[in-house]
Amino acid sequence: DYLINKMRPFIFTTALPPVTLQWTSFVLRHLAEYQEKREHLAAISSNLRTGLQEKGYFSASASQIVPMIAGESSSAVRMAEELQRKGFYALPVRPPTVPEGTSRIRFSLTADVTEEEVKRVIATIRPVSSKS
C-alpha cells in the first residue's frame, strides 16, 4: 500500500488512449508492406541532398528532412519566394528558430514525392555562386 500511494511514477501513470493503441496496432500490422515506400523516400532524399551539394549548398542531413542553408535571412526569403513562384511549397526558416547566418529552406519529403518533382526542385535552385 505504501508504494502504491507514494511511488510517483505509478501514481501518475495512465493508460494510453484507445486511438493510440489502435493506430500502433495498425502500424505494426502493415509495417512490412511499406518497405518499398521507405526505399523510395531514402532514394529521393539522397538525390535531393546530392543535387543541393552539387549546387554548392551544405546539407548534412541523413533523413527525409533536407535543409538548404541559405545563410542570411533575406537570402532564405528570396529563395523561398522563387520556389513558391515555381509551384513549390517552400518556407524560409530564420532566427530565432535557427542560429544567425544559417537561415534555410527545409524540405520535408514524403514517399508521395516523385523523382521528377525532386529533379524540378533541383533545377529551380540557383547555384551558390549565382545567389543574389
Segments from the language model and where they lie:
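Active-site C-terminal subdomain of aminotransferase-like
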Residues: 1-62
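A generic "alpha-helical surface" signal
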Residues: 22, 39, 74, 116-119
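Short, ordered loop/turn segments at secondary-structure junctions
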Residues: 17, 95-97
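Short gly/ser/thr-rich secondary-structure transition/capping motifs
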Residues: 5, 88-91
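Conserved PLP-binding catalytic core of the aspartate aminotransferase-like
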Residues: 34, 39-46, 53-87, 97-102, ...
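PLP-dependent enzyme catalytic core of the Aspartate aminotransferase-like
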Residues: 85-89, 97-132
